[in-house]
A protein has these predicted regions:
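Buried hydrophobic-core signal for structured, non-transmembrane domains
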Residues: 32-37, 90, 97-99, 112-116, ...
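Beta-sheet-dominated interaction scaffolds and their linkers
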Residues: 11-44, 84, 160-182
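Short acidic, flexible loop segments centered on an aromatic residue
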Residues: 46-72
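Short, hydrophobic/aromatic beta-strand segments
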Residues: 42-50, 59-60, 108-109, 162-163
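Intrinsically disordered, low-complexity Pro/Gly/Ser/Thr-rich segments with frequent PxxP/GP/PP motifs
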Residues: 66-103
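Terminal connector regions
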Residues: 51-54, 100-154
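Surface-exposed loops/turns
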Residues: 26-27, 89, 106-107
């Protein structure tokens, strides 16, 4: 039996490993690097963009077309390069991210999401196509993987406070400890 342990700030999907798993600018922080690595066996190209998405009550995601009251987006204040990367097997590259126009930021939290989308391979022009059977119909599905990570800008002191009260520690079935909130 073997166990592989990855640090908790790493995300991988579709052979793309991203670290750290979120971009956060607060205080005097004005730049950072995202590290991308291709963990697959083939060369892969990824397009990088910023999206506005939110989580729905059922846990799914939706694109934001109308912002909620008081909702602020970070995309106007973030510059990043390159906008696309091509990585060979086991290759890595850094994406430089900078906070811009910071003098225009009002106190509060700004949020967007970096979207890393794989770009399917296309055959070069002039390459001979394989002979096709013209007596049948076929369909070819090409999966396009994508992953998002949050980009957050925090300006000023946080006003969020949490208080837990009426906590109880119980033993369920006399063997399993359990916290209960009233």
């Amino acid at each position: 039996i073997s166990t592989v342990i990855f640090p908790e700030d790493i995300i991988a999907q579709g052979d793309l490993l991203i670290t750290p798993r979120r971009v956060v600018f607060e205080g005097s922080k004005r730049s950072m690097d995202l590290n991308l690595a291709n963990t697959g066996k083939d060369t892969a190209t990824y397009a990088i963009s910023l999206l506005q998405i939110r989580m729905k009550e059922d846990g799914g995601f939706e694109t934001i077309t109308e912002p909620d009251s008081g909702q602020r987006f970070a995309d106007r204040f973030i510059r990043f390069f390159p906008r696309s990367v091509t990585l060979g097997p086991n290759e890595a590259q850094a994406v430089k991210i900078q906070l811009i126009k910071s003098n225009e930021l009002e106190p509060g939290e700004y949020r967007s999401h970096f979207y890393f989308r794989s770009i399917p391979k296309i055959s070069p022009l002039g390459e001979k196509e394989k002979a096709k059977d013209t007596t049948t119909i076929s369909v070819m599905l090409t999966p396009v993987f994508g992953i998002t990570i949050p980009a957050i800008i925090r300006v000023g002191e946080s006003t969020a406070r949490v208080t837990l009260s009426d906590l109880r520690f119980e033993m369920a079935n006399d063997t399993t400890p359990r916290f209960t909130l009233v």
